[in-house]
Amino acid sequence: MLGQAHHFLHFNPDRSDYAENRFGEEAQRLYSVLDGQLVGRDYVAGEYSIADMAIWPWAARFEFQKVDLNSFPNVLRWYRKIASRPAVIAGYCVPVETEIPIP
């Protein structure tokens, strides 16, 4: 679903109010679910796992999804924790040297 939010909120040259609302609201809902999952946990499944590796790259495009991570304090904490990992920093720069967006 976040891929659709990317497309309709950031890349789509043809505006669609329906699609922007539909996928924008769904992105907000998914961040809310993730925020709840992270209550009392450092990572999605407790320890750093493939779940975090799969979700974090989508969350790293929060700006494309028009999501304010400050509205999701547990996601923000999790996002920053993963963004500070050396392997994540190195991987984020492939194929082009770029900075990880930090809210």
Cite the ranges covered by each PLM segment.
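Surface-exposed helix-capping loop/turn segments at secondary-structure junctions
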Residues: 36-47, 87-91
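GST superfamily/GST-like fold recognition
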Residues: 2-6, 43-71, 76, 81-82
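Terminal-tail/helix-coil boundary detector
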Residues: 88-103
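Residue-level signal for nonpolar/aromatic packing positions in well-ordered secondary structure
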Residues: 34, 52, 82-88
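Conserved C-terminal alpha-helical bundle
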Residues: 1-41, 63-65, 100-102
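Generic alpha-helical secondary structure signal
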Residues: 17-21, 25, 70-76, 86
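Residues that form generic nucleotide/phosphate-binding pockets
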Residues: 26, 37, 78-81, 91
